[in-house]
């Protein structure tokens, strides 16, 4: 964007019209630089575009016209409402059927999981029974653990204490 000497006066008028004096100060700059800077700041500011400024005229209205309901024959209107009800009933039937199918699939899935669980529990019971039977078979051949029956050594003072407690009762 170049401004020459012929454009300077018009540019100055535009900047003075668009921007009141005193708001923008460019001290120590040439007049051409000041005008360019003013034009930049004016264009960079967030003023709403002129298209968005609503101006109400006598011949213009800002509201869209309201749609009027069509008047049709009574038989056509009842026929369309019947077809709508039939379509909605069909949709309900389709949704109900889809829901039943989904529920039956879930039921089959859960029954399969229950069957798998029972098989696992049965296998664990079988393994436990086998382990117990093997332990019973090998029980006579296992070395007997020595039982440490340590004799209690009761000191005389403990005996005396016990006797005193008995006499108090």
UniProtKB/Swiss-Prot annotation:
Bias kind Polar residues: ranges: 75-89
GO-annotated cellular components: cilium; cytoplasm
Keyword check for Chloroplast: no
Keyword annotations: Cell projection, Cytoplasm
Keyword Nucleotide-binding applies: no
Family the entry assigns: Belongs to the HOATZ family.
Organism of provenance: Homo sapiens (Human)
Domain of life, source organism: Eukaryota
Cellular localisation: Cytoplasm; Cell projection, Cilium
Region listing for Disordered, in residue ranges: 1-21, 52-89, 144-169
Protein name (record): Cilia- and flagella-associated protein HOATZ
InterPro entries named in the record: HOATZ-like (IPR040681)
Biological-process GO terms, alphabetical: axoneme assembly; cilium assembly; flagellated sperm motility; spermatogenesis
Transmembrane regions listed in the UniProt entry: none
Main function: Required for motile ciliogenesis and flagellar genesis by mediating the maturation of the glycolytic enzyme ENO4.
């Amino acid at each position: 964007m170049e401004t020459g000497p012929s454009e300077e006066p018009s540019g100055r008028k535009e900047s003075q019209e668009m921007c009141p004096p005193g708001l923008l100060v460019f001290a120590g700059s040439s007049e051409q630089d000041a005008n360019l800077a003013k034009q930049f700041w004016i264009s960079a500011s967030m003023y709403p575009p002129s298209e968005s400024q609503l101006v109400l005229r006598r011949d213009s209205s800002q509201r869209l016209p309201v749609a009027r309901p069509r008047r049709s024959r009574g038989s056509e209107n009842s026929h369309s409402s019947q077809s709508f009800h039939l379509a909605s009933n069909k949709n309900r039937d389709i949704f109900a059927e889809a829901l039943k199918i989904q529920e039956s699939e879930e039921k089959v899935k859960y029954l399969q999981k229950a069957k798998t669980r029972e098989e696992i529990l049965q296998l664990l019971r079988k393994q436990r029974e086998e382990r117990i039977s093997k332990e019973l078979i090998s029980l006579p051949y296992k070395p007997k653990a020595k039982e440490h029956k340590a004799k209690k050594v009761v000191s005389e003072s403990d005996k005396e204490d016990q006797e005193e407690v008995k006499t108090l009762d």
